[in-house]
Structure formats: structure tokens, C-alpha cells
UniProtKB/Swiss-Prot annotation:
Superkingdom as given in the UniProt entry: Bacteria
Keyword set, alphabetical order: Ribonucleoprotein, Ribosomal protein
Pfam families the record matches: Ribosomal_L30
Annotated gene: rpmD
Subunit structure: Part of the 50S ribosomal subunit.
Any one Gene Ontology cellular component term annotated for this protein: cytosolic large ribosomal subunit
HAMAP family: Ribosomal_uL30_B (MF_01371_B)
Lineage, highest ranks first: Bacteria, Pseudomonadati, Pseudomonadota, Gammaproteobacteria, Alteromonadales
Originating organism: Shewanella baltica (strain OS155 / ATCC BAA-1091)
Any single biological process term in GO: translation
Gene3D superfamilies per the UniProt record, alphabetical: Ribosomal protein L30, ferredoxin-like fold domain (3.30.1390.20)
Protein name per the record: Large ribosomal subunit protein uL30
Family membership noted in the UniProt record: Belongs to the universal ribosomal protein uL30 family.
Amino acid sequence: MATKTVKVTQTKSGIGRLPKHRATLTGLGLRRIGHTVELEDTPSVRGMINKVYYMVKVED
């Protein structure tokens, strides 16, 4: 059985944001605007996405 994944793309810069939000972007593996990563769809990843929802775009 394949695990469900979610694509996350950074749409805004982390400059000038709260340090915890910048750390969350790094934790998601995002490095720059336009960078896309594919992650497992787990509650912890969803929580990180919800924390920085205003800087990312999510595709299921």
C-alpha cells in the first residue's frame, strides 16, 4: 500500500518572519521561493503546514 503524499511549494519569503516560522519552513525542507517538496501526509506535517499556511501552497 502506497503512503499518501502532499506537495508543498513555498510561495513567500521567510525573511522578516517569526523565527519559529522560518524554522518550520526549514523543517519542511523548503529553501527558497518556488521550491517544491513532496512529503508524507502525516498529522505532524499537516501541523507544520498549518503553522506557515500564508507562505506555502499545498497540493494533495
